[in-house]
């Protein structure tokens, strides 16, 4: 097994496909995806284009359709929900399909959708993701951060490091053999430095500060928790994620 960490979708190499690819957007798309599926949502369907989302969701039964739209940390006008995991209660999302478009997370999922296995990961479901990968033993694993509009993000990197660290311990493979690139080693080092205080790291991150300015303090606390959800969001067909 080789693990490659890519800080943003733009860094994913062209012309090659990983056996297993993981999209990470801790603040907040993949955290919200995991939370919604754990709460009983039927599926999450992701879009980069809002007009396409609206057109596709219009074909779905209204009572089982939830439009999730976020731009710049705020709910898109006319949508049912923004990108907060706290909106994803069982009462609200059970048996529903969430049609989702966010600033960053949907881009990373679309960038890796041709991989054999595509997973959405966050800190909240880190161990479920790591256990699945350890069981499946894919030859190549990509962990792709969403970043912020093409730039690096601390929160996605530390989550990538958390997943890689779990696999490092589970497999017993030496780090120099498990890591496919320097970014993997750096991500693990970041996680080791902050694993006892992940909330502090998220509060220092530029997107964390952006959300704090929008009074999303509780979202940051929730998103900084590790291994609280035993759910594995897996791509069923391009752009559609279900609980495995």
Curated annotation (Swiss-Prot):
Keywords, in A-Z order: Hydrolase, Magnesium
Catalytic activity: (2R)-O-phospho-3-sulfolactate + H2O = (2R)-3-sulfolactate + phosphate
GO molecular function: 2-phosphosulfolactate phosphatase activity; magnesium ion binding; sulfopyruvate decarboxylase activity
Enzyme Commission numbers on file: 3.1.3.71
InterPro entries per UniProt: ComB-like (IPR005238), ComB-like_sf (IPR036702)
SUPFAM superfamilies per the UniProt record, alphabetical: ComB-like
Superkingdom classification of source: Bacteria
Cofactor(s) required for function per UniProt: Mg(2+)
Family the entry assigns: Belongs to the ComB family.
NCBIfam families attached to this UniProt entry: PRK00886.1-5
Designated name of the protein: Probable 2-phosphosulfolactate phosphatase
Lineage: Bacteria, Bacillati, Cyanobacteriota, Cyanophyceae, Gomontiellales
Gene name per UniProt: comB
């Amino acid at each position: 097994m080789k693990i490659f960490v890519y800080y943003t979708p733009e860094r994913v190499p062209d012309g090659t496909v990983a056996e297993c690819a993981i999209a990470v957007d801790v603040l907040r798309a993949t955290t919200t995806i995991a939370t919604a599926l754990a709460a009983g949502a039927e599926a999450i369907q992701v879009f980069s284009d809002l007009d396409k989302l609206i057109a596709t969701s219009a074909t779905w039964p209204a009572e089982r359709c939830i439009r999730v739209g976020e731009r710049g940390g705020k709910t898109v006008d006319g949508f049912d929900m923004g990108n907060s995991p706290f909106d994803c209660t069982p009462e609200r999302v059970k048996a529903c399909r969430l049609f989702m478009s966010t600033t960053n997370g949907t881009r990373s999922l679309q960038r890796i959708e041709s991989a054999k296995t595509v997973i959405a990961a966050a800190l909240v479901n880190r161990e479920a993701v790591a256990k699945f990968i350890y069981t499946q033993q894919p030859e190549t694993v990509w962990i792709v951060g969403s970043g912020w509009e093409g730039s690096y993000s601390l929160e996605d990197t530390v989550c990538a490091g958390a997943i890689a660290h779990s696999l490092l311990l589970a497999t017993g493979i030496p780090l120099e053999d498990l890591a496919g690139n320097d970014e993997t080693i750096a991500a693990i080092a970041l996680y080791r430095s902050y694993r006892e205080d992940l909330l502090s790291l998220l509060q220092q991150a530029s997107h964390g500060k952006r959300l704090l300015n929008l009074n999303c303090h509780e979202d940051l606390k929730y998103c900084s928790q590790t291994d609280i959800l035993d759910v594995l969001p897996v791509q069923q067909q391009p752009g559609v994620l279900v609980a495995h």
